[in-house]
């Protein structure tokens, strides 16, 4: 088994504010009963603070010493663990939990514009991952994306293996696949490497996983690092040995590009396959909620929806099965709970790591500073506040990044052609100085405003 300090359902890790437990939600989904269970354990065994992650999961913070076991058992009883090994030893349970790193789009199985029902496709994939004998060898960070062609999609979030539905010239829907990246959207993006029939998706993923494990040295835990040494063609050749069908790419895949997704669609009512129903989306301010809010969100899902929720890769949520006429009521209720409900809200594109309140490595209380910045700027900016050089909470550089150098002081970077975060614009800015600089930024510098 590869050692890891990543939090999980069983592996509660120490943080500055107590224990941290990450609850991996299959495709980001949970029902109202499970949401109440998470709220209850956060209150009973932790500080009551809950975070939404950029992989559509939830994590409970501030877990008190000696209470991790009781918290894990309560979450397992609520059906929030893997379907296998729930009664097994801790190592087997942790391994089965770790491999559930499968991200779907928030309207998977509901979007009328999707090419495939990716929620249905995900079920056997998750089952395979949980039962694979070599799952112990995978890093908990190893992640897979399954994109069914939904209108609302996170297409800039790199994964070790990505899968995306596309329609071939003869009308057949296929599953394109690539490694260490994202489905191609821009003209210059790397194309898919192979494509398979939807029914062969599970076999393809398993073959790619086994090829990775066969080829990767013990200290190589992610696909990008392996490809830097052996190349994609070597890995595909190894995967081919585990497949009963030939691996190939349709010639048209070289020019295929996934349709862009409008990030604003994660807010408000969105149509679904069920006539007269919709899903209503909102975003947790800076990814933070608490037990009371989650409990009330569960009540809202029961009262006005079908009792189900989906967390999103933007640290948000969709309430599903809402009658179209009730959408404004649900939106207002989400706003009353403190969620961001409009793409024009200054917090809509702002991300902050846990900060010094939750992480010993952070040099500043990033979430508190982000709220102060949002109030001063008053407009939308694609902005990431990070407490140190690890740049947690965002999988790719934002248009602007503030890196803490001390309490309430930051270096400001602008993403451009320069490596890393981009060009350093200013050093040791106070919150007021940072707000002034960001307020002067041209709208064209922010991809949200482009």
Where are the regions that the model predicts?
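Flexible, glycine/charged-enriched surface loops at secondary-structure junctions
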Residues: 48-52, 86-87, 135-139, 213-238, ...
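Well-ordered beta-strand positions enriched in small/hydrophobic/aromatic, beta-favoring residues
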Residues: 102, 177, 280-282, 412
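Short acidic (Asp/Glu) and glycine-rich catalytic loops that position anionic groups and cofactors
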Residues: 16-17, 183-188, 215-219, 274-278, ...
């Amino acid at each position: 088994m590869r050692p890891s300090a990543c939090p999980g359902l069983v592996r509660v890790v120490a943080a500055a504010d107590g224990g941290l437990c990450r609850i991996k939600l299959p495709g980001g989904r949970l029902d109202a009963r499970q949401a109440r269970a998470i709220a209850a354990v956060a209150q009973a065994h932790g500080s009551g603070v809950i975070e939404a992650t950029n992989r559509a999961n939830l994590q409970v913070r501030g877990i008190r010493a000696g209470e991790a076991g009781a918290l894990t058992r309560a979450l397992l009883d609520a059906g929030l663990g893997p379907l296998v090994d729930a009664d097994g030893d801790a190592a087997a349970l942790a391994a089965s939990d770790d491999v559930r790193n499968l991200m779907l789009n928030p309207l998977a199985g509901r979007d009328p514009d999707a090419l495939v029902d990716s929620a249905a496709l995900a079920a056997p994939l998750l089952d395979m991952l949980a039962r694979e004998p070599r799952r112990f060898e995978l890093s908990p960070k190893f992640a897979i994306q399954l994109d069914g062609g939904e209108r609302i999609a996170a297409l800039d979030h790199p994964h070790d293996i990505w899968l995306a539905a596309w329609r071939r010239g003869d009308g057949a829907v296929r599953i394109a696949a690539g490694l260490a990246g994202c489905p191609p959207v821009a003209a210059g993006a790397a194309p898919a490497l192979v494509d398979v029939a939807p029914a062969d998706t599970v076999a393809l993923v398993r073959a790619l996983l086994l090829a990775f494990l066969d080829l990767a040295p013990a200290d190589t835990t992610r696909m990008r690092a392996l490809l830097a040494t052996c190349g994609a063609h070597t890995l595909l050749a190894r995967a081919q040995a585990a497949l009963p069908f030939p691996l190939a790419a349709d010639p048209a895949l070289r020019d295929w590009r996934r349709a862009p997704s409008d990030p604003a669609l994660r807010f408000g009512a969105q149509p679904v396959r069920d006539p007269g129903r919709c899903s209503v989306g909102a975003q947790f301010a800076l990814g933070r909620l608490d037990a009371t809010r989650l409990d009330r969100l569960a009540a809202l899902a029961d009262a006005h929806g079908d009792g189900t929720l989906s967390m999103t890769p933007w640290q948000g949520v969709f309430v599903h099965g809402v009658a179209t006429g009730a959408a404004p009521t649900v939106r207002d209720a989400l706003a009353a709970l403190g969620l961001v409900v409009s793409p024009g809200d200054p917090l809509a594109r702002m991300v902050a790591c846990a900060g010094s309140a939750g992480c010993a490595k952070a040099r500043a209380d990033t979430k508190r500073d982000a709220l102060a910045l949002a109030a001063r700027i008053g407009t939308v900016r694609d902005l990431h506040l990070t407490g140190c050089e690890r740049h947690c909470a965002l999988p790719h550089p934002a248009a602007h990044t503030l890196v803490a150098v001390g309490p309430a002081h930051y270096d400001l970077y602008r993403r451009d052609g320069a490596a890393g975060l981009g060009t350093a614009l200013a050093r040791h800015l106070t919150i007021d100085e940072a707000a002034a600089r960001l307020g002067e930024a041209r709208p064209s510098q922010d991809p949200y405003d482009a």
